[in-house]
Amino acid sequence: MKKKPFYKVLYVQVIFAIIVGVILGHYYPALATDMKPLGDGFIKLIKMVIGPIIFCTVVTGIAGMEDMKKVGRVGGKALLYFEIVSTFALLLGLAATHILRPGVGFNIDPATLDGKAVASYAAKAHGQSTVDFLMHIIPNTMVDAFAQGEILQILLIALLFGSVLAHLGERGKVVTDFIDGLTRVLFGIVHIVTKLAPIGAFGAMAFTIGKYGVGSLVPLLKLIGTFYLTSVVFVLVVLGTIARFTGFSIIRFVSYIKEELLIVLGTSSSEAALPQLMEKLEKAGCSRSVVGLVVPTGYSFNLDGTNIYMTMAVLFIAQATNIELTWMQQLTLLAVAMLTSKGASGVTGAGFITLAATLAVVPTIPLSGMVLILGIDRFMSECRALTNIVGNGVATVVVSAWEKELDRNKLRQALTGGGEVTTTETAGV
């Protein structure tokens, strides 16, 4: 097959678009901020099909399961994995901030901080108890769940729908076949929309640099550098070790999903690449049923980048305002962060709202301290989203392996660039 010219390769186009966006934002900030609708429009096009794709993928996956106990088993294994890896992410963020101490030397007086700029985030975070979160998973109506794009609500509906179809067996085959056909149509739409990724990445990056400016990064470069370094260490060491024990290379896996990562980099939203990631994971040998359950659930329960960010940001604010946290307070912070990080969607700004919810239960640190990182949160959002999507991809491969539903031949072919295969070699770790 004839190789594509490099300028027609999607990830090359996205890289070029990001570079052009940065240049425009730096030299023509007023014009660059007007590019925001390009990024917003691309994300809206992707979000338009996320709900239906999750519904169809989960329904067909569950309907094809002969043993309904398997649904609970896969979900249980996924949640166990999420909790273990999330805890590592939270601890790594805490440890890195203690070692590198990015907030030391700021000597900020908490009384001089104006909390008005972060009041809206605090308001959104206030009062979100565990009960509220669980009740929110239940939609008012089925239509409302799709209209609002609530992933967990759609997942609940799909689980019920798929379970009933599995119970009906042959009597439900017509409906299952229809939904399977609809899935193919939806992924066809995603392929069309993905071609617009360079435009979306350009618009989002131009707006970010134009509005906030590269200069806004300078005073807080140490925090940004600490966060990016910690995230890289997490991916290479923590996820890399998990990948190695599962039988694949984290470097090759990251290379395999590079187009999705660049879309996320340009838009700062891991949701922007959700449909493409699901398709890539299936092509890499993960079973549809596992992909359909693990990926959507991971977007609320397995946000590794957000976990690193939360403990790091809280400790940074404490260091910058010269507030000493006891070990008991830090353990409380970890426990609270494990709860507040669940349900945070992979969209831009969600991490900041989650941070507000975490700070609200650590009274010794002023909520107004969030002002210190408000200006750079948008630049840290990219790294959060990138870490989140890699984490969810690895989680899906691992759970597929645990379930002995990982086609290792396909995985090997995909990660080495050998193309698709037709033989099936299903095995677990």
Swiss-Prot record:
Membrane topology of the entry: Multi-pass membrane protein
For this UniProt record, the keywords arranged alphabetically read as follows: Cell inner membrane, Cell membrane, Membrane, Symport, Transmembrane, Transmembrane helix, Transport
Q: Which GO terms describe its molecular function?
A: fumarate transmembrane transporter activity; malate:proton symporter activity; succinate transmembrane transporter activity
Query: Which cellular compartments is it found in?
Result: Cell inner membrane
Extract one GO cellular component term from the record. Answer: plasma membrane
Q: Name one Pfam family in it.
A: SDF
Biological process GO terms, please? L-aspartate transmembrane transport
Q: Does the keyword Cell inner membrane apply?
A: yes
Kindly list the residue ranges recorded as spanning the membrane. 9-29, 45-65, 79-99, 149-169, 185-205, 223-243, 308-328, 356-376
What InterPro entries does the annotation carry? C4_dicarb_transport, Na-dicarboxylate_symporter, Na-dicarboxylate_symporter_CS, Na:dicarbo_symporter_sf
- This protein's source sits in the domain of life called Bacteria
PANTHER family (alphabetical): AEROBIC C4-DICARBOXYLATE TRANSPORT PROTEIN, PROTON/GLUTAMATE-ASPARTATE SYMPORTER
- Function description: Responsible for the transport of dicarboxylates such as succinate, fumarate, and malate from the periplasm across the membrane.
**Family membership:** Belongs to the dicarboxylate/amino acid:cation symporter (DAACS) (TC 2.A.23) family.
Protein name as it appears in the record: C4-dicarboxylate transport protein
Organism of origin: Burkholderia lata (strain ATCC 17760 / DSM 23089 / LMG 22485 / NCIMB 9086 / R18194 / 383)
In the record, what lineage is assigned to the organism producing the protein?
A: Bacteria, Pseudomonadati, Pseudomonadota, Betaproteobacteria, Burkholderiales
Supply the gene name.
dctA
